[in-house]
Amino acid sequence: MEAGPVSAVVGRFAPSPSGRLHLGNLACSLLAWLSAKSRGGRIVLRIEDLDAERCPRKYADQLEEDLGWLGLFWDEGGSKGGPHEPYYQSECSGIYTESYKKLEAMGLVYPCFCSRSQLHAASAPHTSDGNVIYPGTCRGLTAEEIAEKRKKKAPAYRLMVPDENITFTDGCMGEYAENLLRDCGDFYLRRADGVFAYQLAVVVDDARMGVTEVVRGADLLSSTARQLYLYRLLGLPAPKFAHCPLLLASDGRRLSKRDGDQSLENLRARYTAEDIVGRLAYAYGLQEEPAPRTPESLIKDFSWDKVPKKDICLPEGLFE
């Protein structure tokens, strides 16, 4: 697999269509759009529906309609198509297999028979995004042990990582460093049911689509070291990263798709698109009052220097 052609700045929307968009998703999408468009860049829409059963196509269609309603238009991808198809991860298994086999040929992939409950029972430490840091239980299994375990259970597959520090400068959060072995651990490349893992899929897709900048939530900051390692192993150009602060409910809870009152489905009944965009711009420091705005009108006001570095609690009454 070769990286796609790069022309200036290429950002992306990469939502998982497992439900309707909420304010946190919208904020990241707005910042990604503004970051690219403020420098004359393009936006790719990729639908991250790796787990197709949890991500019915109707949600992807609704997601496109919602983004368009807000004025967050993209240049290629989704149902619009373009030169880097497919744009739905559920259609990319063959592409991921090619990169997976390269890693396998390096001797870095091994089968893992551990269940999530076993790892939690072992009190393994957790990464900052809540995942268990794998203690390497299956890393040294012999061929005989693997064959015996296969009789009882299909394995998932992990990538072996070195004891190495990965450092980078985040466009929003600044300097960041993680040790691959201590802070991340060997991580999944493929589930036992054959579905490829997020870490591999996003690296392969961002490279082949020519993405030069990844803007996403700060909850994914700790995924970046693993992804930079994959870019290096696969010989692919890595994009720049900017992780925006998470949007929290006024009581400090992290917003999720379960927060129906903050879903775009409900917000559209109470606010115009310009109302929502303007209020989000205010929450993220792009304007001094929550006045209605279009994304286009915010381009001249955008700067990462204005965006807070810490998670943002929605001001009481901003979205009633």
Where are these regions (language model features)?
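Active-site cores that bind ATP or allylic diphosphates and position pyrophosphate for catalysis
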Residues: 117-256, 263-267, 319-320
